[in-house]
Regions:
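Negatively charged, low-complexity tracts enriched in Asp/Glu with abundant Ser/Thr
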Residues: 1-41, 68-83, 94, 99-132
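Intrinsically disordered, low-complexity regulatory segments enriched in Ser/Thr/Pro
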Residues: 41-91
Length: 132
């Protein structure tokens, strides 16, 4: 499967689990990016190469990675650990919901509104399943 194929698989699987999703396909590389619940549950990077340190994606699906690992709060998953990544993403959202309660959804709306005026990901991303 290609990086783009994995992106659409993730979008489909995460939609099933109730996430609001935006996605972006990079122009200069084959990398793809998914924002979870307008960023409240962080983001996913899908790639076959090391990313830039200034963009700290919490969840990374790495094509060609032999073994999954964690480094400074960032998680790098091999294709073999795809299902573990889905479970970890769901667990992280559950922790955010426990922490913020109903405010979680208020933060989503705030990020959605503020994101409309931002450059970068927000201006180029496509909505996959915006239910808000």
């Amino acid at each position: 499967m290609s990086i783009k194929d994995y992106m659409f698989k993730l979008l489909n699987d995460l939609d099933y689990h109730g996430f609001i999703l935006q996605y972006y396909e990079a122009y200069s590389t084959s990398s793809c990016y998914i924002k979870l619940d307008y960023g409240i549950s962080n983001s996913i990077r899908i790639a076959d190469h090391k990313g830039k340190d200034k963009y700290p994606y919490r969840f990374n699906l790495m094509i060609g990675l032999d073994k999954s690992y964690e480094n400074n709060g960032r998680y790098y998953y091999s294709i073999d650990d795809y299902n573990k990544m889905i479970l970890d993403i769901k667990k992280f959202k559950d922790e955010q919901l426990d922490k913020y309660g109903f405010s979680y959804y208020e933060y989503m709306l705030k990020n959605k509104k503020e994101g409309k005026n931002k450059k970068g990901f927000w201006s180029k991303a496509k909505n996959y399943n915006d239910k808000f």
